[in-house]
């Protein structure tokens, strides 16, 4: 969610393979940890002349077999998509020479989160879903990649429950205006002039029937323990994520005070029908996060005046500092299915390298498995974050990267590391 200054000038890629100096660290009062550098080959599964990427870090791009990997294909990477720019939705067949199989095209996509492309829970062997636009209206489709059969849903989707029964979504047009790089262009926003609409916010979509209803409005969110900075501010939601059993969700509630250069953030949680809304964090900063289980969230966020990784417990004021001295910067953090490791990354350092990190949960060694050059020309909304994603068996990692001059997808085999 952070950005750096750009200019695409060269190709560069660097792995480090020597053992790094031990970095002493206390992890929330637990045992000392260390940082190691252990090179893992980043193998491209896409190539030119077109660019390819998947999108965000909280979804698994592989099918149930681990053979097919979802991807978007685009002809450019150096500007924001316009309303008439289509991305090709497709599959990468890793058992057939990484052949890209186009399935459809979409006008509803962005650089940071793609088109919310994912395999449907419970049908990861054949069903995918993604967002589209017709005229000024966004919607989503569920596609059977075997038969080609397509079912249309009346709203775009943001997050899907673990059982595949419902989804949560928001206003992608509002998001495009308030947070470029995360929403979609070309859509209609009936509430554009309303700074905290009572009829817009988070909608729940029944994935069997397509029925959708508003469960948490922006007006209601703004009325929860309001702050002085909210007066006359424009409000929006971003980064919805449902917990591991579908019983709660988290969302970032953001607002920009009039005349302010940046926004403020707090994190809300609620039941899947919008009930029992709770302010989980209200210290102004919350970035990337993942649910550890049905109650706890790992996030790079502020707890008091400290910005660091914290483990928050839902519906409490508990926030435990995590990875002190080891996980030192914001990154796109996620857990594998067995919850034994944390996968994360960094933003570009002084050498414009992004580091890809595995960290043994909770408090074991940090292993830096790769460093990837970030082309200066790709910055702000067009930047290419690694957005690392786990395979379903927790043995591979997929990333988007432009370290070789094009935006492509790479896979790293981490089985030997995570087996330790």
Each language-model region and where it sits:
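Blade-terminus and WD-like Trp-Asp/Gly-His loop motifs, strongest in beta-propeller folds
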Residues: 60-68, 115-127, 159-166, 241-248, ...
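Loop/turn-rich, solvent-exposed surfaces of beta-rich toroidal or solenoidal domains
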Residues: 325-361
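N-terminal secretory signal peptides and thylakoid transit peptides that target proteins
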Residues: 2-21
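Short, conserved, GDST-rich strand-edge loop motifs in beta-rich repeat architectures
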Residues: 72-85, 172-198, 253-263, 347-348
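Conserved blade-ending motifs and adjacent loop-strand segments that build the rim/top face
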Residues: 323-332, 366-387
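Asp-box/WD-like beta-propeller blade repeats and closely related beta-sheet repeat scaffolds
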Residues: 116, 131-201, 218-226
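Surface-exposed loop and turn segments in beta-propeller and other repeat-based domains
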Residues: 45-51, 103-110, 213-231, 369-380
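Blade-loop segments of beta-propeller domains
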Residues: 56, 86-127
């Amino acid at each position: 969610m952070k950005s750096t200054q750009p200019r695409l000038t060269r190709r560069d890629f660097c792995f480090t393979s020597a053992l790094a100096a031990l970095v002493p660290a206390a992890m929330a009062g637990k045992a000392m940890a260390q940082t190691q550098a252990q090179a893992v080959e980043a193998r491209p599964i896409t190539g030119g002349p077109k660019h390819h990427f998947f999108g965000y870090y909280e979804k698994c791009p592989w099918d149930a077999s681990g053979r097919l990997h979802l991807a978007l294909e685009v002809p450019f990477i150096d500007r924001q998509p316009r309303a008439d720019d289509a991305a090709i939705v497709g599959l990468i067949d890793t058992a057939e020479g990484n052949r890209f199989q186009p399935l459809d095209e979409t006008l509803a996509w962005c650089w940071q989160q793609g088109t919310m492309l994912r395999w449907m829970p419970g049908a990861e062997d054949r069903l995918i879903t993604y967002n589209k636009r017709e005229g000024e209206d966004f919607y989503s489709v569920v596609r059977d990649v075997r038969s080609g059969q397509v079912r249309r849903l009346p709203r775009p989707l943001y997050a899907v429950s673990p059982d595949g029964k419902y989804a949560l979504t928001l206003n992608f047009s509002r998001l495009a205006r308030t947070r470029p790089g995360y929403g979609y262009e070309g859509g209609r926003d009936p509430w554009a002039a309303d700074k905290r609409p009572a009829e817009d916010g988070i909608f729940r979509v029944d994935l069997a029937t397509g029925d959708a209803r508003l469960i948490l409005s922006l007006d209601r969110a703004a009325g929860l323990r309001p702050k002085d900075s909210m007066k006359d501010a424009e409000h929006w939601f971003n980064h919805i994520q449902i917990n591991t059993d579908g019983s709660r969700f988290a969302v970032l509630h953001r607002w920009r005070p009039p005349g302010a250069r940046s926004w403020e953030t707090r994190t809300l949680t609620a039941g899947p029908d919008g009930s029992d809304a709770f302010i989980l964090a209200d210290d102004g900063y919350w970035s990337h996060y993942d649910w550890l289980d049905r109650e706890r969230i790992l996030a790079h966020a502020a707890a008091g005046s400290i910005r660091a990784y914290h483990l928050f417990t839902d519906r409490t004021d508990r926030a435990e500092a995590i990875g002190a001295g080891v996980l030192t910067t914001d990154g796109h953090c996620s857990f594998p299915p067995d919850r034994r490791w944390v996968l994360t990354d960094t933003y570009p350092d002084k050498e414009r390298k992004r580091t890809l990190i595995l960290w043994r949960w909770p408090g074991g060694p940090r292993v830096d498995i790769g460093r990837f050059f970030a082309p200066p020309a790709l910055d702000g909304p067009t930047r290419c974050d690694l957005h690392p994603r786990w395979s379903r068996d927790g043995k591979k990692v997929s990333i988007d990267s432009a370290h070789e001059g094009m935006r492509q997808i790479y896979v790293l085999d981490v089985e030997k590391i995570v087996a330790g």
